[in-house]
Design a protein with these regions (language model features):
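Extracytoplasmic small-molecule ligand-binding "clamshell" domains
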Residues: 30-105, 175, 265
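Short loop->beta-strand "edge-of-pocket" segments that line small-molecule binding or catalytic clefts
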Residues: 30-38, 43-46, 133-151
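Periplasmic-binding protein-like
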Residues: 37-40, 115-119, 209-248, 269-272
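Extended ligand-binding regions for polar small-molecule ligands
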Residues: 57-66, 134-140, 145, 228-265
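Ligand-binding cleft/hinge of the Venus flytrap
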Residues: 60-67, 111, 147-176, 183-184, ...
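Acidic, polar ligand-binding/catalytic clefts
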Residues: 73-135, 146-149, 219-220
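Short helices/loops that flank or line small-molecule/ion binding pockets
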Residues: 79-91, 134-137, 174-199, 207
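A ligand-binding cleft/hinge motif common to bilobed small-molecule-binding domains
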Residues: 80-86, 95-105, 155, 192-223
Length: 272
């Protein structure tokens, strides 16, 4: 018994040393709180059957985890996510349309996630094609709450916002199923057209198996949709700059092959 106690006492300094070494390392792991909305396949709410979080979340996880960050995710609708970032409840939101106009509550990273080509979804056989705002006359358009197209087409966003067009604009609310609902509304002839990121349209069309009833038409809106991460101004400036720098450097170093691999994982490609 005396021998066992002696062994135990000899172990105490070793245990104390290990605790002293390990605790600082454990405390250095910072938690990054990430708010994001459902925009498959770029950002996705996971489930037991489908645990994947999407292209951009995979990208985000790779960049920040490699620098020792723990990522905590909050799956919320876009409008709520923006408020949570502005209020400091989340540190960042991984994708938001880039704009040169300052926005209250957050700042952009320098490096974009992607510059997306847009396209439209219509019922199969519909001869309509986008040819400027005038071509939308009489068409029922779907969009989501808080969605902003002004960075790719000021005219398109003005059309959606104009009270005179209210009877032709359907704002579709939801949690994680807004785009799915819009596709079904087009199929059911409740709305006529919907514009979005081409990759999103490809993914949802394939997942809902609606190729026989709907079609993606190109070209879409005038400019590419440039999206960037946004970071809360509630974060102390030094910490915020470090988070932004980590993203910018990680995104710049990501190879084209890596990008393509992330996209192929979700079965989408950039259409030339």
């Amino acid at each position: 018994d005396r021998i066992e106690r002696s062994k135990m006492y000899r172990l105490i300094p070793i245990i104390a040393f290990l605790v002293a070494v390990c605790l600082p390392r454990m405390s250095h792991a910072e938690t990054l709180k990430v708010c994001y909305d459902q925009w498959p396949p770029m950002t996705m709410f996971p489930s037991e059957e489908a645990p994947a979080r999407g292209v951009i979340i995979d990208m985000l996880d790779e960049i920040y985890s490699s620098k020792g960050y723990d990522l905590e995710y909050f799956e919320v609708p876009l409008a709520r996510g923006l408020k949570m970032v502005a209020n400091g409840l989340c540190d960042m939101l991984p994708e938001f349309p880039a704009s040169e106009t300052p926005r209250e509550g957050f700042v952009y990273a320098s490096e974009e996630t992607f510059a997306y080509t847009t396209a439209f979804v219509v019922r199969r056989g519909d001869p309509w094609r986008y040819n400027g705002i005038e071509s939308m006359k009489g068409k029922r358009v779907a969009t989501g709450p808080g969605w902003d197209y002004s960075s790719i087409s000021v005219g398109y966003q003005n059309y959606l916002d104009n009270p005179k067009n209210a009877e032709f604009v359907e704002v579709v609310a939801g949690y994680d199923d807004v785009v799915d609902r819009i596709f079904n509304m087009i199929k059911e002839n409740r709305v006529d057209i919907y514009a979005d990121n081409d990759l999103v349209l490809q993914f949802v069309m394939k997942r809902l198996a609606m190729n026989d009833t709907l079609q993606i038409i190109r070209p879409g809106l005038e400019k590419k949709l440039v999206e960037k991460p946004i970071f809360s101004t509630k974060i102390p400036p030094k910490k915020r700059q470090k988070l932004i720098r980590t993203w910018d450097q990680g995104r710049m170093l990501m190879t084209r092959e890596k990008e393509t691999g992330l996209l192929k994982k979700y079965g989408v490609i950039f259409e030339e």
